[in-house]
């Protein structure tokens, strides 16, 4: 692999020397003599007149690439250098300064290099730079280093994970121990409560039967609570089972609905999806409206509570409601008075207009009802069509069979009805036939009698037609007269009813006027009472003074009660201090501590006894020995036999 040239090679190139080819002898290049320095032609090695070599930049390519005098191939110094060779170091500047000194040029102090520690002399060529080409070994070393770092981090993470697992195991064991200890503490607290209860009973010298009664009462109460808990648990299990059954039914219904939905045509499915989305939107709106309504209810309750706490606001609200009611009554009375001053013709016209309006409203409502019924029928037909469309060919066949079966049932029903009613209908028809025959015979007899009476005075055919036409005309006139008479009767009845209404309306108006006059007088009296604001203010002031007096009395009682409570508290503290100083109290505390120690000792002895019993448990061994003896006896008996 080719390596870039070092700084020494660059210095030689700057001084006019080049590196010889690899494997050959270094030949001295042409260099100017001392006397030829001033007259040397301008070339790549010649600096401009008046220019400083030290202040010049790095050497150009003309100083690098020329072949040697022998014409051999260029050395490795003429190869492509790395990025570090683009900026020459201070060593190259020192070589350039040496060349300038040999050329006899004057050094410029202001262009001297500045080192790390200030202005100093020029340094010689420093050591070369590091690696310039990143080859395979470099990357392999980097990969090894990264792999070692990853392995180190992995091992650290594994150790941390193991530490966390150990801590988790310790935490689980400690948690289990804490739960066991909490249970044990709870049991001990219950035992301590029982001991304290017994100690209280012993200290109060309660008889044994009282303790037994309390024990029985507590036992009964615990049994009742246990039964109640069992009932609640049973009810909960029943409810959970019912809920599961309901959920299973809902899932089945949902599955059937999904199946029917999948069997629907795309248009109906899209319509169903649209309706479902609309339903969800309506449910969301309903929920939002319910929330708003709840907020309004809460605000209303808060306002009502505030109003209930403030008696002045309550009184003000009552007065405002009374004023509003009186104002409405005043308007009503004014309107009724105005109506009472009107003539009967105007009242009748208003009544007729009101009747017309009512009739119009009734017709509109009837029309709306018809439209709604039509819409309901359309929606029912649509639902039927949707239900029929989802069932497919099987549903159509089933529907056709059902229709045929219904037709057969209807025909059979009609046939049975006909057979059941045939005798009665036959008798009726025979009776009707007999009556018609008797009528025909009677008519023939009358005709024979009339022919015998009239003889040859029978009218001609033309005269008979005229008489028949005249008879029809008379019948028509009679019908018209009867129709006119009926219409006149109806109109007469309507007029009589209107007259009765008018008569009753006059009486009613008079009665209402009398009542309104009485109500007006009563309202005027009430308005006079409410109109005196001074009386109301005087009553309110009197009530306020009475309340203030009651408040002062209550405050005095409050202070008195506080003083009594403070005095009783001091007495209680004195009694407690006296009790603490009493010898019996000290002895009782000592006995309580001794009882606790004895209880602890008893508990430890019980544990010790249980442990020893478990260690010296011989029953299992005895049972095993007995079983072995039985087996041996059986084998001995078999051997003897």
Swiss-Prot record:
Q: Name one GO biological process term.
A: intraciliary transport involved in cilium assembly
Tell me where in or outside the cell this protein is found: Cell projection, Cilium
Q: Coiled-coil segments, which residues?
A: 139-633
Give the domain of life. Answer: Eukaryota
UniProtKB keywords: Cell projection, Cilium, Cilium biogenesis/degradation, Coiled coil
Tell me one GO molecular function of this protein.
Answer: beta-tubulin binding
Gene3D superfamilies (alphabetical): 1.10.287.1490
Signal peptide from the UniProt entry: none
Region Disordered: start-end pairs: 1-99
Question: Where is the segment annotated Basic region?
Answer: 1-132
What segments bear the compositional bias annotation Low complexity? 37-62
Q: Which GO terms describe its cellular component?
A: intraciliary transport particle B; motile cilium
- This protein's major location comes to other
Its subunit composition reads: Component of the IFT complex B, the core composed of IFT25, IFT27, IFT46, IFT52, IFT74, IFT81 and IFT88 as well as associated subunits IFT20, IFT57, IFT80 and IFT172. Interacts with IFT81; the interaction is direct: within the IFT complex B, IFT74 and IFT81 mediate the transport of tubulin within the cilium. Interacts (via basic region) with beta-tubulin (via acidic region); interaction is direct.
Family as reported in the entry's similarity comment: Belongs to the IFT74 family.
Q: Which PANTHER family match?
A: INTRAFLAGELLAR TRANSPORT PROTEIN 74 HOMOLOG
Role noted for this protein: Component of the intraflagellar transport (IFT) complex B: together with IFT81, forms a tubulin-binding module that specifically mediates transport of tubulin within the cilium. Binds beta-tubulin via its basic region. Required for ciliogenesis.
Q: What is this protein called?
A: Intraflagellar transport protein 74
What are the leading ranks of the lineage? Eukaryota, Viridiplantae, Chlorophyta, core chlorophytes, Chlorophyceae
């Amino acid at each position: 692999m080719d390596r870039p040239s070092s700084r020494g090679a660059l210095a030689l190139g700057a001084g006019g020397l080049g590196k010889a080819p690899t494997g050959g002898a270094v030949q001295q290049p042409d260099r100017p003599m001392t006397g030829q320095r001033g007259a040397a032609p301008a070339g790549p090695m010649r600096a401009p007149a008046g220019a400083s070599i030290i202040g010049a930049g790095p050497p150009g390519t003309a100083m690098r690439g020329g072949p040697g005098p022998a014409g051999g191939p260029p050395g490795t110094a003429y190869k492509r250098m790395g990025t570090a060779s683009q900026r020459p170091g201070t060593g190259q500047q020192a070589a350039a300064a040496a060349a300038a000194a040999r050329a006899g040029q004057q050094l410029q102090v202001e262009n001297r290099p500045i080192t790390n520690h200030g202005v100093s002399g020029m340094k010689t060529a420093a050591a070369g730079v590091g690696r310039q080409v990143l080859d395979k070994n470099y990357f392999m070393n980097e990969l090894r280093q990264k792999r070692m770092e990853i392995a180190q981090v992995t091992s650290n993470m594994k150790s941390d994970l193991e530490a966390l697992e150990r801590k988790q195991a310790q935490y689980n064991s400690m948690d289990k121990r804490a739960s066991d200890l909490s249970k044990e503490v709870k049991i001990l607290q219950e035992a301590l409560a029982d001991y304290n209860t017994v100690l209280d009973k012993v200290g109060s010298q309660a008889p044994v039967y009282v303790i037994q009664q309390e024990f029985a009462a507590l036992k009964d109460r615990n049994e009742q609570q246990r039964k109640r808990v069992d009932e609640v648990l049973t009810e909960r299990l029943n409810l959970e089972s019912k809920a599961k059954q309901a959920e299973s039914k809902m899932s089945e219904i949902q599955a059937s609905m999904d199946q029917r939905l999948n069997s629907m045509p795309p248009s109906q499915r899209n319509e169903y999806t649209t309706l479902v989305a609309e339903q969800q939107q309506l449910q969301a709106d309903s929920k939002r409206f319910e929330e708003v309504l709840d907020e309004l209810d809460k605000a209303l309750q808060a306002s009502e509570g505030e109003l209930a706490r403030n008696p002045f606001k309550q009184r003000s609200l009552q007065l405002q409601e009374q004023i509003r009611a009186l104002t409405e009554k005043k308007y009503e009375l004014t309107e009724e008075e105005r109506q009472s001053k009107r003539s009967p013709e105007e009242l009748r016209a208003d009544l007729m207009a009101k009747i017309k309006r009512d009739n119009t409203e009734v017709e509109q409502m009837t029309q709306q009802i018809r439209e709604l019924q039509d819409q309901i029928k359309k929606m029912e037909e649509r639902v039927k069509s949707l239900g029929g469309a989802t069932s497919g060919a099987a549903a159509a066949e089933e529907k056709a069979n059902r229709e045929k079966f219904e037709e057969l049932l209807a025909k059979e029903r009609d046939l049975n009805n006909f057979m059941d009613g045939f005798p009665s209908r036959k008798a009726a028809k025979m009776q009707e036939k007999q009556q018609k025959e008797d009528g025909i015979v009677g008519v023939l007899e009358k005709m024979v009698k009339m022919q015998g009476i009239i003889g040859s005075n029978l009218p001609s055919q033309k005269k008979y037609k005229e008489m028949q036409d005249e008879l029809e005309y008379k019948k028509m006139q009679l019908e018209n007269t009867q129709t006119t008479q009926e219409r006149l009767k109806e109109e007469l009845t309507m007029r009589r009813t209107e007259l009765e209404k008018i008569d009753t309306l006059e009486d009613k108006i008079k009665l209402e006027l009398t009542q309104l006059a009485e109500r007006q007088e009563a309202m005027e009296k009430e308005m006079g009472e409410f109109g005196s604001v001074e009386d109301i203010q005087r009553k309110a002031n009197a009530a306020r003074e009475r309340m203030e007096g009651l408040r002062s009395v209550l405050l005095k009682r409050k202070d008195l009660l506080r003083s009594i409570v403070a005095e009783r508290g001091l007495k209680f503290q004195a009694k407690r201090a006296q009790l603490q100083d009493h010898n019996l109290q000290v002895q009782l505390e000592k006995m309580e501590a001794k009882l606790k120690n004895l209880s602890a000792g008893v508990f430890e002895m019980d544990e010790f006894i249980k442990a020893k019993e478990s260690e010296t448990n011989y029953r299992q061994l005895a049972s095993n020995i007995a079983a072995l003896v039985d087996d041996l006896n059986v084998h001995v008996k078999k051997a003897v036999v």
